[in-house]
Amino acid sequence: MQKSLVSLAWVFVAILGAICLGVLALHKGESINTLWLVVASACIYSIGYRFYSHFIAYKVLKLDDSRATPACVRNDGKDFVPTDKAITFGHHFAAIAGAGPLVGPILAAQMGYLPSILWILIGSVLGGCVHDFVVLFASIRRDGKSLGEMIKLEMGQFVGMIASLGILGIMLIIIAILAMVVVKALAHSPWGFFTIAMTIPIAILMGLYMRFFRPHKILEVSVIGFILLIIAIYAGKYVSLDPKLASIFTFEASSLAWMIMGYGFVASILPVWFLLAPRDYLSTFLKIGVIGVLVVAIIFVAPPLQIPKITPFVDGSGPVFAGSVFPFLFITVACGTISGFHALISSGTTPKMLAKESDARLVGYGSMVMESVVALMALVCAGILHPGLYFAINSPEVSIGKDIADAASVISSWGFNISAEEIREMTKNIGESSILSRTGGAPTFAIGLAMIVYHILGDPSVMAFWYHFAILFEALFILTAVDAGTRTARFMIQDLLGNVYKPLGDLSSYKAGIFATLLCVAGWGYFLYQGTIDPKGGIYTLWPLFGVSNQMLAGMALLLVTVVLFKMGRFKGAMISALPAVLILSITFYSGILKVVPKSDNSVLNNVSHVAQMQIIKEKMATTTDEKALKTLQKSFFNHAIDAILCVFFMLVALLVLIVSVRICSNAYFKNKIYPPLAETPYIKAS
C-alpha cells in the first residue's frame, strides 16, 4: 500500500512538471509568472535525481560501499581525507559554481527564455549531472587521478599528452573569461572596485587569524570576514560619493586587466593559507547563503518574466553574442547545463575526499543539479528586467553608442521600447555612473537581484546596496576561481615542462614555480587584455570560444568514461555517457567549424567566424590611411588569427580522442580485446 502511494506521488510530480513546462512553452502573453518555472524545475530535478541517478549508480556503475575509496586507502590527513558527504557536497559545489552558470544563461536570454529553460532542464538531467557523476566515479576507481592522467592510462601515452595540452589551453581560456567578467563589472565603478579591493586585506587578516590566533575556527573567521565585507560595501558608497576618492578608485577595463594579472600571479605563488584558503571559506559560505536566500526570494516575490518566450534574435543577429540558436545557444549556456571544467574538479580534490562510493551520487549528480538551479536563477534575474533595459546593459558600445538617448532609440528600433529616462532611473537607483554596455553578465545578475530585494522591501533606496552586494558576491568567488585556476594550471604547465627539462617539473622548486606561473598568467592574461580592448566588448567574441572549448572538454571526459564502461563490459550502460558525448561533440564540432569558415554573403556567419573577420579586417586595412586605425585593425586581425588557431587545435584534440575512443570501444565490443588494459585500482575491502 505504502509503495503504491509513493508511486502515485511520483506520477503526480511527473504530471505537474509536464503541465508547468507546457505552460511555459505555450504561453502567449507579454509576461509569465516565474513560479511556473520554479515548479517545473523542482519536479524535473526531483525525478532526475530520484530515478535516473539511482539507475546510473546501481545498474550501470554498480557503486560498491564495501570497496575502500582513495580517501580511506591513502588517508594522509592532507590531500586524502575521508569526509562527510554533506561537507564534500558543499566543497564540490563551491568549486564548480563559478561565473559560468551566472553568465551563460544571461547572455542566452537575448534569444528569449524558452530555449534556455528547455536546454538547462533537459540537458543537465541527462547530460551535465551524468558527466560530473561518472567522471567522479572513474577517478575514485583510479586512485583519485586527474582527467589527463586517466586519458593517458586508458587511451595511451600519446593521446594523453595531446589531451593534456588541450586541457591546459582550455583552462587558460576559462580563467581569462572568468577574469573578464570581473573586469567588466568593476570598470568605471569606484564603489565596486573599492569593495573588491578591500577583500584582499580582509582575506589576509582571516588567514593570519586562523594561522596564529584561532586555528581551524573556519565558521568563526568566516563570520568575522562577512561582517568586514558588509562594512566594506557601506564604505564603498561614501567612496563613490566623494569626487576625489571616486577618481582614485575609478579605472578603465584595460587597467583592471593588468591589475588582475598581477593579482593572479602574486596570489598563486603565496602560501595557500595566506590568501587563497580564507577567500575560499568566505566565498563558499557567501555563495551557498546568497543562492539559498535568492531561491526563497524568487518563490516569495514570484516576479513575472518580462523577456519574450522567443525573440527575433534566434537567427543570430542579436547584439549580445554572435551566433544563431543552433548551435550557439548550447555553447553559450555552457556551464549551466554541462561543463568540461567540472571534469577537472571531479578528478581533482573531490575524489580524494569521498568516504564511500555511494557518496558520489549526491556529490557528483546532486551538485550539478544545484548548479543548474543557479543557472535558472540567473536566467530569472535577466528575464524579470524590462527587455529594453536588458539590451542596454548587455549590448556592446559599438551597437548602441555611448549616449543614453541614442541607446534608447536604437534598442526601441529593435522592438523593445524603452525611454532614456527609464535607463537613467535604474542607473541612479543602483548608484552607478552608467549601465550602458556593462557586458559580461555580472551587472545584469546584480540588477536582477537588487530588483527582487526591492520588490520585498518596497524601497528603491536599498537597490544600490544590494546591487553592489551582488557584484561583491560574484567577484569574490570568481577571483577565488582565478586564484585556484592559475595554481592548477601552473601544476599542469610544470608537469608538461618536466617532460622537456626535468628540473622545471619539480613542484617543490620555487624558481620553477615562478617561471610556470609567469607562463600561465601570460597565457590567460593575453586573452583577458584582448577582450578589454575589443570594440564589441570581448564577451561577444570570446564567450563562444570559451563555450566551444569548455563543451569539447566535457565531450572528451564523457568519451573517457564510455571507454572505461566498454572495457568493463557494460556496453548498454555505456550509452549514458556515449549519447551525451555524441550530442555535445556534434554541437561543438559544428560550432567550431562555423568559427573558422571563410567570408560569405551570410552576415551572421561572418560575425561568428574568426576567419571571415580576418578577411573583412584585411579589406579594411587595404583602404585605411589613418595610422592609429591601422594599428587597431592589425591587433584585431592578430587576435582573430589566434582565436581561429586555438579553435582548430581544440577540435583536432577532441577528434583524436574521439577516433581513439571509437577504436578501443570497437575492439572491446567486437573482438573482446581490451587495450590499453583497464587501469582500475585493485579491490581493497573497506574497514
From Swiss-Prot:
Superkingdom: Bacteria
Keywords: Cell inner membrane, Cell membrane, Membrane, Peptide transport, Protein transport, Transmembrane, Transmembrane helix, Transport
One Pfam short name: CstA
Main location: membrane
GO biological process: one example: protein transport
Membrane topology field: Multi-pass membrane protein
InterPro entries according to UniProt: CstA, CstA_N
GO cellular component, one term: plasma membrane
Subcellular location(s) of the protein: Cell inner membrane
Residue intervals passing through the bilayer: 6-26, 29-49, 87-107, 117-137, 162-182, 190-210, 221-241, 256-276, 285-305, 325-345, 373-393, 440-460, 462-482, 513-533, 546-566, 574-594, 642-662
Keyword match Cell cycle: no
Similarity comment text for this entry: Belongs to the peptide transporter carbon starvation (CstA) (TC 2.A.114) family.
Function of the protein: Involved in peptide utilization.
Protein name: Peptide transporter CstA
Organism the protein comes from: Helicobacter pylori (strain ATCC 700392 / 26695) (Campylobacter pylori)
Lineage of the organism: Bacteria, Pseudomonadati, Campylobacterota, Epsilonproteobacteria, Campylobacterales
